[in-house]
Regions:
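Conserved binding/recognition cores within well-folded domains
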Residues: 2-102, 106-108
Length: 112
């Protein structure tokens, strides 16, 4: 299964990301997520963790596949090995590489 963007007919509606989400071991189902709700994505142990407003989701989708899908939108930044950040959820970027998110979380970005 691959991820893909779904563009609405009405330009005022949200663009959706359709991605296979792991429900239990060996079981996944398609999940649709508004791009505005996606905070950041990190690669961890051959899986991707999607950190969203609703919570965290895990997928076996490849990082390359998701990067190709998301980076053309200009709202996502490839922040280093295994990290995609949604600029809409960033409050501040420090010169040290620390990124302060609007939810108060701090993540480290190796690319500046």
């Amino acid at each position: 299964m691959y991820s893909k963007l779904i563009f609405p007919l009405d330009p005022n509606d949200a663009v959706l990301l359709e991605i296979p989400v792991i429900i239990s071991q060996g079981v996944s189902q398609k999940y649709r997520l508004a791009l505005d709700d996606l905070i950041y994505v990190e690669a961890c142990q051959h899986r991707l963790i999607l950190h969203t407003i609703q919570g965290d989701f895990t997928t076996r989708c490849t990082f390359t596949d998701l990067t190709v899908c998301l980076t053309p939108s200009d709202r996502f930044f490839h922040g280093g090995k295994g990290l995609l950040i949604n600029f809409a959820h960033v409050s501040l970027v420090q010169v040290t590489g620390e990124v302060l998110l609007k939810n108060g979380q701090i993540i480290f970005c190796s690319r500046r």
